[in-house]
Amino acid sequence: KIGSEYICDGKAFKIVSIKEAIKCDDGNSIILITAIDYRSIYNQLSVYGYDMQRCISIDEIARNQLEISNYSDVIYESKDKLIPKKIHYAWFGKEKPDLIKKNIEHWKELCPDYEFYEWNDTNYDITKNKYMKEAYESKIWGFVSDYMRLDIIYKYGGIYLDTDIEMIKKPDELLYQKCFASFDATFVMNLGSGFGAVAGMDIIKELRDYYDTVSFVNKDGTYNKTSCNSHSYNVMKKYGVKVNDRLQNVHGMNIYPMIFQGACGHTNTIHVTNKTFWIHYGNLSWMTRELKNEQ
């Protein structure tokens, strides 16, 4: 990619080598690393003798933010429960590991009065969206549910959880609002970290329909592994979402700070307070095994 440009929010950024970037440094610059594999970049910078005091990764910032992340209270929009007591989750690919099975059983123990729905290729039409179908046929399971979970919540209402979420407390108090989600350590909303809504919520439909405009398989045959966070941000930014880890309502959706889900996945950091409903461990099934092993 060196020599090409990366387009972000309509701005073009030239991609250069680390050596060239250091040459452009006038001594007043700070390098902010946004890549997941920030440790490797640190190593490369140190080889060139770069002043590491002027270098930091967004993941380390997120780790520090998680320690102070907070919000006043869960929002109540009604005296009556609005979101139905339904918990949805998805599983594609091989048989669920025992750890995942035990985790789901733990949900059921905490929420005996909830209805649980497992969605997979036997009870859901994965061909109804091109992006989802391409991810399924490519066996890149971590992307298959991105469209599906929005479609399910829009149609039936309830709460969606990724299977690598450990529930800390029963989510009853979350049911008195029309729609909720949370930020994660990327400082933007992550629907994989759990979200809920009443059926027919407009913002859920818009987030779902966005996937009709993108493909998972690029024209050159490579995979479009843009995260669901980035896809969601493309929708939410036009409604004024702020990247600040603060509780905010965006087009009817209450988005809670990252402490709501208690984890900074890229640094393997967990922090739980009385404001944490569950921990999203983020097994990052969409990330290559090689990079996960390095971390």
Give the predicted meaning of each segment.
Residues 1, 161-163:
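Active-site flanking residues adjacent to catalytic metal/cofactor-binding acidic residues
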Residues 1-60:
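A solvent-exposed beta-alpha-beta segment
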Residues 2, 9, 26, 156-157, ...:
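Feature targets compositionally biased, intrinsically disordered low-complexity regions
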Residues 146-158:
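Small-residue hinge/turn detector
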Residues 34-145, 163-295:
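Glycosyltransferase-associated regions of secretory-pathway enzymes
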Residues 29-30, 86, 159:
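Structural motif
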Residues 21-28, 80-82, 152-154, 272-273:
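Flexible, charged surface loops at secondary-structure boundaries
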